[in-house]
């Protein structure tokens, strides 16, 4: 349904919630949003719901309020779980718990989380020792716990009144389906289920995975049925692939007083560009989070970014959903998201709670069709902007600066290569490959935007004919050292072991060749027959070759002994090899 909720419906909903819940609500919130009234009314009428509502519209309270009332009515035992909320990331779980806590404290209920980043044994111990009334979990971690203690979990969840799937469009990906089936097997079938997302769960079969029955559809839409808030303005900038990094930096520099969130396609990309940007944006607070950060580090970085006035956060999609930082001015997407629906979630980190916000995506020339694709499939219109301060000359100057940064530390050099590889792997899997295929991507330009010194060999690029256009650097990468002395010492050891292994392999091959030739000589009676110059001449040539090869083998063995005794320097080893 698409409507504005009237005063009568809102009043009726308030009456259903009861005084305890309203007391907490009225202290912190001014009024109900449409999605809260519509979804909450259906849930309290004991109907399943599928809710599609824009980011920043109050979806969390849309299930928290009716959930608290349902648990209140159920009169749970102290050790019974009355509600299970599944969310795709630990940050979202943490944020949901923060919304629930004031209501839970008022009603003397205990809310707990189980997410990745914690030990499974610790989670199991919590189930055994604590009375849990509301559980907020990532499906992957809850699945792991069920694998260890299914009977215990099923017993704890026998009183579940409500199952909530937050960011439901993420859960119809293949990796979640097995987890969901196992989780659903542990909770009662006679329960209510709510699916909540900013974008549509597109297939009917997806609803079957979650066990919904005769679900009510709630759709609170903005203009043109867009999933984005009306206060959000979406832009794109067209630029050559090799100027993307320059355009990104110049755009940020023009907005010195703005808080900016930048999305990159992989953990390695975030780590690499954090190293680059901290040397290029020296006057701005810079933060970075990705899926492989530790929980304390991620929490500290998000908190510091939230408290900054003009900070720049570099992130993967861990920041794309549910992270409620209300004053982000600009969201920048360095490249296309893996799924077009994720564009909406990324952009939705700005323009929250009625504030104005802006989102920008960097589009390479060969990716221009994506603008129409977004309009047709996600109902998102993009307006073009220019970044006049970014030029090809500045892009080349930046590339040279990035090369110097890599030369200063081998760790950054290797990180840049891994970041580029993961970027290509991610691009090969996005959902609009028919209009923006990897075959059409300017790979050489993208490599230059990463300032690569060497183009790595990749299976995804094996058939490309244009890679010879890449201008390989004259810098000898093997001479670049780690800034960390421990890493450099370890590299020396590894290189020495490789040299030794190579010489040992050569010696073994030579020994095998000599043995084979000896057997051949024996079978021929000690003489080779020659078609051209006669047996005697051929025999002399064979003996000469054998003598030379034996000398080479002996030299290799002597060299190996010198290396093992440490009598050769690194340069002498390299020159000999």
Curated annotation (Swiss-Prot):
Example GO CC term: the record gives: nucleolus
> What spans are recorded as compositionally biased (Basic residues)?
510-530
Q: Does the keyword Hydrolase apply?
A: yes
In what residue span(s) does the Helicase C-terminal domain sit? 231-393
Enzyme Commission number, as recorded: 3.6.4.13
Region Disordered, residue ranges: 508-577
Comment on protein domains = The Q motif is unique to and characteristic of the DEAD box family of RNA helicases and controls ATP binding and hydrolysis.
Kindly provide the name given to this protein in its UniProt entry: Probable ATP-dependent RNA helicase DDX55 homolog
Q: Which organism is it from?
A: Caenorhabditis briggsae
């Amino acid at each position: 349904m698409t409507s504005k909720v009237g005063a009568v419906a809102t009043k009726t909903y308030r009456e259903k919630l009861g005084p305890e819940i309203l007391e907490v609500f009225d202290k912190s919130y001014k009024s109900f949003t449409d999605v809260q009234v519509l979804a909450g009314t259906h849930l309290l009428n004991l109907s399943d719901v599928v809710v599609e509502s824009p980011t920043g519209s109050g979806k969390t309270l849309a299930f928290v309020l009716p959930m608290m009332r349902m648990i209140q009515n159920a009169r749970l035992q102290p050790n019974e779980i009355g509600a299970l909320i599944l969310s795709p990331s630990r940050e979202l779980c943490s944020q949901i718990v923060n919304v629930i806590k004031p209501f839970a404290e008022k009603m003397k209920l205990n809310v707990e989380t189980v997410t990745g980043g914690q030990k499974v044994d610790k989670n199991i111990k919590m189930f055994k020792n604590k009375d849990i009334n509301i559980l907020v979990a990532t499906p992957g971690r809850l699945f792991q716990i069920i694998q260890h203690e299914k009977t215990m979990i099923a017993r704890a969840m026998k009183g579940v009144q409500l199952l909530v799937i937050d960011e439901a469009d993420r859960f119809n990906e293949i990796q979640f389906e097995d987890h969901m089936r196992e989780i659903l097997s542990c909770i009662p079938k006679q329960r209510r289920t709510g699916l909540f997302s900013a974008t549509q769960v597109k297939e009917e079969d997806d609803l079957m995975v979650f066990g919904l029955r005769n679900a009510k559809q709630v759709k609170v839409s903005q203009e043109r049925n867009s999933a984005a808030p009306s206060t959000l303005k979406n832009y794109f900038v067209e630029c050559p692939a090799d100027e993307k990094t320059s355009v990104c930096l110049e755009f940020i520099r023009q907005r010195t007083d703005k808080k900016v969130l930048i999305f990159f396609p992989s953990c390695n990309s975030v780590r690499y560009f954090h190293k680059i940007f901290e040397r290029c944006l020296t006057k701005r607070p810079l933060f970075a989070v990705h899926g492989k950060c530790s929980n304390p580090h991620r929490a500290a970085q998000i908190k510091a970014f939230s408290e900054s006035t003009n900070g720049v956060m570099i992130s993967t999609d861990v920041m794309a959903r549910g992270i409620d930082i209300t004053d982000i001015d600009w969201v920048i997407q360095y490249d296309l998201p893996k799924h077009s629906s994720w564009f909406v979630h990324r952009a939705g980190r700005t323009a929250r709670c009625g504030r104005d916000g802006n989102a920008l995506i960097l589009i390479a020339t060969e990716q221009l069709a994506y603008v129409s694709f977004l309009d047709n499939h996600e109902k998102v219109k993009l307006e073009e902007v220019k970044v006049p301060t970014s030029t090809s000359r500045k892009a080349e100057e930046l590339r040279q600066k990035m090369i110097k940064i890599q030369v200063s530390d081998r760790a950054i050099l290797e990180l840049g290569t891994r970041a580029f590889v993961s970027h290509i792997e991610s691009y090969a899997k996005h959902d609009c490959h028919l209009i923006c295929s990897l075959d059409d991507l300017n790979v050489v330009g993208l490599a230059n935007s990463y300032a690569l010194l060497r183009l790595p060999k990749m299976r995804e690029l094996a058939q490309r004919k244009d890679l010879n256009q890449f201008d390989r650097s004259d810098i000898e990468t093997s001479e670049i050292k780690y800034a960390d002395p421990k890493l450099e010492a370890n590299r020396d050891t590894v290189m020495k072991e490789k040299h030794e292994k190579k010489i040992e392999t050569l010696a073994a091959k030579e020994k095998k060749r000599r043995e084979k030739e000896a057997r051949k000589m024996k079978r021929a009676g000690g003489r080779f027959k020659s078609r051209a110059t006669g047996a005697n001449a051929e025999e002399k040539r064979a003996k000469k070759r054998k003598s030379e090869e034996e000398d080479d083998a002996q030299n290799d063995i002597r060299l190996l002994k010198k290396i093992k005794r440490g009598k050769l320097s690194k340069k002498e080893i390299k020159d000999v090899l």
